[in-house]
């Protein structure tokens, strides 16, 4: 097993329903340590840059509009195989297809408002963490 860092973004639907603590409980109970966390409103430019890999997809504009519709919570998570572990506890992208006991099954409202984003690879994790956090913001 390898200790890894991964990125997580709690989406506006969770913040609006005051469920941040509940999401953090899922993450911590799964064995992930929150080593950085901050709340902010993403600008349209930040959202477009962050989701640039989806720019050509039909859902890009609605994704940017949704993710900028309210505050998000940005996180750096640490743990053994943190990327896979986070993806597992998040559940399938579509809450209707997610397994019972996952964040998206229990809290997700739709494919877009599915409560949480998590890095899907080591390269993505590095890029996404660097996009939002300086090294000094990550507390061991």
From Swiss-Prot:
GO BP: CTP biosynthetic process; GTP biosynthetic process; UTP biosynthetic process
Magnesium listed as a keyword: yes
Key words, A-Z: ATP-binding, Cytoplasm, Kinase, Magnesium, Metal-binding, Nucleotide metabolism, Nucleotide-binding, Phosphoprotein, Transferase
Catalytic activity: a 2'-deoxyribonucleoside 5'-diphosphate + ATP = a 2'-deoxyribonucleoside 5'-triphosphate + ADP; a ribonucleoside 5'-diphosphate + ATP = a ribonucleoside 5'-triphosphate + ADP
Domain of life, source organism: Bacteria
Compartments it resides in: Cytoplasm
Protein name: Nucleoside diphosphate kinase
């Amino acid at each position: 097993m390898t200790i890894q860092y991964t990125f997580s973004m709690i989406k506006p639907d969770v913040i609006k329903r005051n469920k941040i603590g509940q999401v953090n409980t899922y993450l911590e109970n799964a064995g992930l340590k929150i080593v950085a966390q901050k709340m902010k409103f993403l600008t349209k430019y930040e959202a477009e840059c962050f989701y640039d890999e989806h720019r050509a997809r039909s859902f890009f504009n609605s994704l940017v509009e949704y993710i900028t519709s309210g505050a998000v919570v940005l996180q750096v998570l640490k743990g053994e195989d943190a990327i896979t572990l986070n993806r597992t506890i998040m559940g399938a992208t579509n809450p209707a297809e997610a397994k019972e006991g996952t964040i998206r099954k229990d809290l997700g409202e739709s494919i877009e408002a599915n409560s949480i984003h998590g890095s899907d690879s080591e390269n993505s994790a590095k890029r996404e963490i660097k996009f939002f956090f300086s090294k000094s913001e990550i507390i061991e």
